[in-house]
Amino acid sequence: MRPAGRSANQVRPVTLTRNYTKHAEGSVLVEFGDTKVLCTASIDEGVPRFLKGQGQGWITAEYGMLPRSTHTRNAREAAKGKQGGRTMEIQRLIARALRAAVDLKALGEFTITLDCDVLQADGGTRTASITGACVALADALNKLVAAGKLKTNPMKGMVAAVSVGIVNGEAICDLEYIEDSAAETDMNVVMTEDGRIIEVQGTAEGEPFTHEELLTLLALARGGIESIITTQKAALEN
């Protein structure tokens, strides 16, 4: 029995609250159960130097955790004077995932920065960040079109992510912290709304997993992501 009584393929309740903050072009509070992440999308005219003159835009991301988003306080990375390896890995993942959702040529020479700040962590913060940031990005792009700065919306479709893993020999979807910490295999999967894979991050923490188990985990992830994307689309319609 899972901690919340969920079935193996069931994601936690997902809530996406749009326009959560006042100033950002897109802002979303995303909740996967007790995991809560504030995602904002900020638009700047111009692109990084390596893209100047190429007529395309750029999407980048930053990720961070509030000191008491976890069970015990973690010092702010700013106080340490540098970002940790985990932070850099996650923010690069978020940026890669969201670039796959946008036609960068159609975006033109705009840069959109996605800031994902974890308010409360209970497993799956990177997958929640991708899911919420995608909705914030959609809102920001809609504002560019509404302002007449873009002729067409460059959004190609929704992108979402979910964690899957093997715990006590059972493949399960959307792991809470207590499950994640006990997982024999832990995997994060990012997909498009038509089921294409953007990224798979998978590690055997204990016993190596089989090819068949990998396929089972990917199928679980696809089902979970389909459910999450339905929630994303419903949020954007409200």
Swiss-Prot record:
Q: Does the keyword tRNA-binding apply?
A: yes
What's the Enzyme Commission number for this chain?
Answer: 2.7.7.56
Molecular-function GO term, any one: tRNA binding
Has the keyword DNA damage been applied to this entry? no
Q: Which residues bind phosphate?
A: R86, G124, T125, R126
Q: Which Gene3D superfamilies match?
A: GHMP Kinase, N-terminal domain
Q: Name one GO biological process term.
A: rRNA catabolic process
Class of this enzyme: transferase
Entry keyword set:
Nucleotidyltransferase, RNA-binding, rRNA processing, Transferase, tRNA processing, tRNA-binding
Q: Which reaction does it catalyse?
A: tRNA(n+1) + phosphate = tRNA(n) + a ribonucleoside 5'-diphosphate
* HAMAP family associated with the record: RNase_PH (MF_00564)
Q: How does it assemble?
A: Homohexameric ring arranged as a trimer of dimers.
Q: What does this protein do?
A: Phosphorolytic 3'-5' exoribonuclease that plays an important role in tRNA 3'-end maturation. Removes nucleotide residues following the 3'-CCA terminus of tRNAs; can also add nucleotides to the ends of RNA molecules by using nucleoside diphosphates as substrates, but this may not be physiologically important. Probably plays a role in initiation of 16S rRNA degradation (leading to ribosome degradation) during starvation.
User: Member of which family?
Assistant: Belongs to the RNase PH family.
The identity of this protein, by name, is Ribonuclease PH
Naturally occurring in which organism (per UniProt): Klebsiella pneumoniae subsp. pneumoniae (strain ATCC 700721 / MGH 78578)
